[in-house]
């Protein structure tokens, strides 16, 4: 993505989100919804004594840990640092930890954990859509490049597939 494309994309996103009451909350809403669904799912598993709770906790935690370790090793700059243009929403400049996207990786790992526990097609589709919204917002808000989000998705899917098959 070029600087001009980045500016055009974030300005378009900014114009749309400026119309929303509580823009910062609106941008965080899908992530908070994903976390709430995950917590509710874990509570259901806990109260029913379902042993799948172990994988539903461990696999996303491993994914989160792997992504957290990889980010400084890769050291890719975020688009807003690279182009010198602030993103939409809150941000911390100069950290150089863009790839892979931790929000997207976590959302994908949570979606896979919930699909593992509740393998109904409607649940799987809803979680996949929520994950896609979270990843898309990371790009459209200027927090990440598409490659950051795709790397996070791929990594989460591999870790989840391996973790849920062992």
Annotated model-derived regions:
Residues 1-39, 51-54, 67-96:
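N-terminal transmembrane-helix/juxtamembrane module of multi-pass inner/ER membrane proteins
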Residues 31-42, 62, 126-129, 134:
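Hydrophobic alpha-helical transmembrane segments
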Residues 55, 59-63, 67, 152, ...:
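Alpha-helical transmembrane segments in multi-pass membrane proteins
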